[in-house]
Amino acid sequence: MAGKKGSSPNVYAYFKVDGDKVSRIKKVCSRCGKGTYMSEHKDRNTCGKCGLTEFKQ
């Protein structure tokens, strides 16, 4: 049986590293919780899992 290949390089697009600190770039969905990020559009943030939409002011 083949082993796991490792993590996807696309995961690193969600985080920013500044020295010793790691911060999230995208907003976390308030309904789904940790691990689910919201997509950023021109006028709103949308969760692809539950469909929650937060409009920007």
From Swiss-Prot:
Name of the molecule in the record: Small ribosomal subunit protein eS31
Keywords: Metal-binding, Ribonucleoprotein, Ribosomal protein, Zinc, Zinc-finger
Disulphide bridges: none
Coiled coil: none
Family matches, as Pfam families: Ribosomal_S27
Zn-finger region bounds: C4-type: 29-50
Cofactor binding notes: Binds 1 zinc ion per subunit.
